[in-house]
Amino acid sequence: MSNNPLIDYPELPPFSKIQPEHVLPAVEQLVADGRARIQQVLAEGKFDYAHLVQALDEEDDRLGKAFGPAGHLNAVAQNEALRNAYNSCLPLLSEYGTEVGQNAQLCAAYQTLRDSDEWSSLSEAQQKDIENTLRDFRLSGVDLPEDKKAQYMANSKRLSELTSKFSDNKIGRASC
């Protein structure tokens, strides 16, 4: 995977090197890395800002740095192979986002940080970040019964598919 230009590039995205066949493997690898990092953080049980929030933000940043350039190229290149590669990632990203948002252990870890002595020493921005993350857990259905979580996941995937189809249709119409 080290030859994939979407993974761990130093500064600006290497747009000229990005090919459609790089997109899905990069996203799959980075989602797997994100899942592994979440499990590692939870297993370590050290729920302070550096070990919880910053660690997971770094993984999210890696995923965003990979998928962001792919999304940009998809929007401007009007290349069917790239569009297919981009679209093939959407269900995985939707599933991963919902999975993270509904992770009760992760939500509890953030709540532990919120209730800790460290809370008062965090900056206003850091506190707001944690509060927003706790809100996002609730909005993602972390407290729903399992059957409702599954329905939420299915709805999220379907919304992702429809949004992508709408964008594809817009691009197709613009090129007419």
Annotate each PLM feature.
Residues M1-S175:
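Zn2+-dependent metallopeptidase catalytic domains
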